[in-house]
Amino acid sequence: MMNPVLWLQMTNMISYQGLVRTFLNKNDLKAFIAFPSSLYPDDPNWIPPLFIERNEHLSAKNPGTDHIIWQAWVAKKAGQIVGRITAQIDTLHRERYGKDTGHFGMIDAIDDPQVFAALFGAAEAWLKSQGASKISGPFSLNINQESGLLIEGFDTPPCAMMPHGKPWYAAHIEQLGYHKGIDLLAWWMQRTDLTFSPALKKLMDQVRKKVTIRCINRQRFAEEMQILREIFNSGWQHNWGFVPFTEHEFATMGDQLKYLVPDDMIYIAEIDSAPCAFIVGLPNINEAIADLNGSLFPFGWAKLLWRLKVSGVRTARVPLMGVRDEYQFSRIGPVIALLLIEALRDPFARRKIDALEMSWILETNTGMNNMLERIGAEPYKRYRLYEKQI
């Protein structure tokens, strides 16, 4: 397998209808990462990602690159970058679904159909050279990272590790022959609006007698993260586009969560001492970095640490949640999920976290979507995954 870093070192320029379409050069990486901010000067909901985090995400430090090879392009007009895109092959996806599918991601561009055509033309041509006959996305870089194109909910800022976008993206992508694969939903709830009906409370009290809900054990953090991985892979294995998390990916994620998430915001549910479900409540880092313009220097580090550890943030996101497969369609499976959500209420109150995003949830997951609606949440953002035969 070719090292992704080597792909970044390739350079080539192709003229396309007055544009210059360029393979991403290693020296262009900074401009590639910074480009989206040029599209949002008047958008109060745009939050520039931290450059250091995006740089690591697009490097061999991202454990996803153990099984992903990828290429990236920028489109230039009059010497200025006007768009960007990636294309990638995920070997774990191919092992599970066959070798005919590749993916695209990190699509951002000005409101110009020629720019979109140039970028997607480059991505599709490269994927064809890798044996793909089908393309889906956007993924940055796979389904376990940032996924989906924002199509509803432009009027609010994204939570941590969720994408933003421009309203014109969908129309230009669909004009190129892409069609809906599936939608992902983000649900929003105020902590004080979290309510359980008498019927739900009765069910929860019955199941509570059989289930132990505990905080993660920080003394065994690495081992606990692998328990979470096993539960996630078990519970999500039948979902659309599922690709399993690797041990390396979850270990790296654990190294990050260890410093960002308090112990009492990661819960594991057990039945007869056997872990069966979990939930992770992540303080909304985007709230803490909104005014840092993507930089932690010279004083960004101090501001970020103060906001996360001292003053706190007022919103959070549940980026990871899972119930083992054997409980998915049982009577107690959904109730275990409710008990885990309930467990976050008190630690949120102690930290003055007022609101929570649950994301993302497949639109076809009617059980979870109905449950969230019943406890006071509302769907406030919708993201689309597209597909196309190439």
Swiss-Prot record:
Disruption phenotype: Reduced formation of biofilm. One of its GO terms (biological process) is single-species biofilm formation. SUPFAM superfamilies: Acyl-CoA N-acyltransferases (Nat). Induction: During biofilm formation. May be missing up to 10 N-terminal residues compared to orthologs. This is Protein YghO. It comes from Escherichia coli (strain K12).
